[in-house]
């Protein structure tokens, strides 16, 4: 039996900053991660230019999708403040 309200194309992703604070997002596997990044910034009040998003220690491109990165339900994206002191 097929569930019409199935979320089979969606996954839950958590973000975690350097202080251990987390946020939960539910997005389609084909949604560009820029949307998640923008939503994170809106919730946290941070400017997207001041942050770096990483998956398994590797930087994430705004145009990447969970599908492209082989992300699974429950994966965690790390969020770091960019070091702008010497840039």
Predicted regions and their residues:
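Ubiquitin system architectures
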Residues: 1-87
